[in-house]
Amino acid sequence: MMKTLQTLGFIAASMMVSTTFAADFSFDRPWAGMGTGITPVGHLAWEQGLPSVSYQQDNVAGAKDKTLTLNADMLLRTGLADGLELQLGWQGPVWQQYKHAGTKKETNGLGDVSIGLKKAINLKDDRLTMALLAEAIIATGNDEFTAHDDIYSLTSAVAYEFSDLIGTSITMRYEAQNSDWAVTAVPTLDYKIAGKLSGFSEFIYRKAESQDYEYGLGTGLVYAINDRAQLDASVGVDLNGSGKSYNGGFGVSVLF
């Protein structure tokens, strides 16, 4: 009897620890920036676009040039050790429609894959958190949906929680493709709206070597089903250039 009680007590304690870890965990979807949460050891996080959408419109030779792209991007995250996780990503199946001067073309294929290691940095502050991500995007996708050359990047994220209602963060991403460099900065403001519903707003700045500056705005909503699952919806707009460019989509994230 005593042995049975000890076994049940151990199982209950394990469940309590698991629940605590799940409560402290945070997903990286859907913002352009990166969160500072790390997947607990023994758990798997699945973050899935349902789908992600982008739309570009420009004038070429006096005619409207429109491109609509849908892709079911996904990210798998699993804890390797305390404060360290492995990330495996895929841009997913992609469908694209191109319209120009009364003509229409549709293509579909597969996007690139990625692999990364994310490490939490202990700042010894209850409100201030930090994480680093070393990532490689491997150009394995079809010709229309690939970066063509591998991209290697180092990303840092620092977040500060002002209260239970509002927080802010800054993400810096440094990437190299062949001998070309690019840097991206994403300051983000996240806020609780009501109950399980929260929102975020962000500004995206990017400068690639030998390219013009790029700017964008993004905002979205996140509904926490529970500590282990959430739904999200987001929309963004690019501010550079004379054409129109929008992005957004829906997604679901689950921690197993």
Spans of features found by a protein language model:
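Transmembrane beta-barrel domains of Gram-negative outer membranes and organellar outer membranes
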Residues: 22-256
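Cleavable N-terminal export/targeting peptides
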Residues: 1-28
